[in-house]
Amino acid sequence: MSTVTITDLARENVRNLTPYQSARRLGGNGDVWLNANEYPTAVEFQLTQQTLNRYPECQPKAVIENYAQYAGVKPEQVLVSRGADEGIELLIRAFCEPGKDAILYCPPTYGMYSVSAETIGVECRTVPTLENWQLDLQGISDKLDGVKVVYVCSPNNPTGQLINPQDFRTLLELTRGKAIVVADEAYIEFCPQASLAGWLAEYPHLAILRTLSKAFALAGLRCGFTLANEEVINLLMKVIAPYPLSTPVADIAAQALSPQGIVAMRERVAQIIAEREYLIAALKEIPCVEQVFDSETNYILARFKASSAVFKSLWDQGIILRDQNKQPSLSGCLRITVGTREESQRVIDALRAEQV
């Protein structure tokens, strides 16, 4: 009689699943953390709600109203969740039949689209971007049959560039009546003029993902948003957990989205952009750096000679970057989060010392 193990009892797709390799999961013993696109210094808040004996609101009113005002949409067009990652998953759960429907995304891009779909048992289709990392619209059109959700990250992680708005319009026309198009705007605060939030009235099948993890400097809070038309939001409300945000999270999020909080965020963005330009200019002069790509975000993608050796050398010095070698078309590439001036200087000095 064969013995059935606990692993045998698990779903086949979970047994075969490779979990998302988050920056924290990859570990390291660094003191210069430039691998997760976090803000480099902590922001401070005081808790104002002393009601931890009560369950929180499912969709905290102050958070929703503040975010709607900030994003220029109606409160009915906002859903708050445990990070934008939960929003990615909710869209698949609401719109995709496991074993029947598919999602589509365009690598090189963020890894959670595929992990969320595979966890739920939904097929993943990929259409790699063109050489300039823009959308291959013909390739997408050819693979749309049976696709219910299309994910497009703009600005794209890890490449750092915006998707051409005209290509977004073409994609939205291609998918009208067929699929939800999700614009992942996790980094939009660094290029706010490029947001698609103003397009919601025109495209009922558009959804937009946002987060407080980047420009708002609250990665540890785990608070994200989905912006969409009310019909989409109502469907997502059916599948979200009853209490997605704890009371302290909602309390701090509402403060971060106050008028003073928005001003502080914009000051942080200006500081990071200035530091990004300083770091880009320095990287271009370093012998082991082959190419530095333009960025609209708080990180820089660069191609290195002997990138694996460079990555390990900096790792051993306590400078933790993100290796992108396994991503399509990113051979030799490392991603560097823009940190403080001191952190930038540590990176620059370490790279200058590399004998490649």
Curated annotation (Swiss-Prot):
Molecular-function GO terms, alphabetical: histidinol-phosphate transaminase activity; pyridoxal phosphate binding
Pfam family, one: Aminotran_1_2
This enzyme's EC code(s): 2.6.1.9
Keywords from the named record: Amino-acid biosynthesis, Aminotransferase, Histidine biosynthesis, Pyridoxal phosphate, Transferase
InterPro entries from the UniProt entry: Aminotrans_II_pyridoxalP_BS (IPR001917), Aminotransferase_I/II_large (IPR004839), HisP_aminotrans (IPR005861), PyrdxlP-dep_Trfase (IPR015424), PyrdxlP-dep_Trfase_major (IPR015421), PyrdxlP-dep_Trfase_small (IPR015422)
Domain of life, per lineage: Bacteria
UniProt keyword Amino-acid biosynthesis present: yes
Biological process terms in GO annotation: L-histidine biosynthetic process
Cofactor: pyridoxal 5'-phosphate
Class in the EC hierarchy, top level: transferase
Pathway membership: Amino-acid biosynthesis; L-histidine biosynthesis; L-histidine from 5-phospho-alpha-D-ribose 1-diphosphate: step 7/9
Self-association state and partner proteins as the record states: Homodimer.
Record protein name field: Histidinol-phosphate aminotransferase
Organism of this sequence: Escherichia coli (strain 55989 / EAEC)
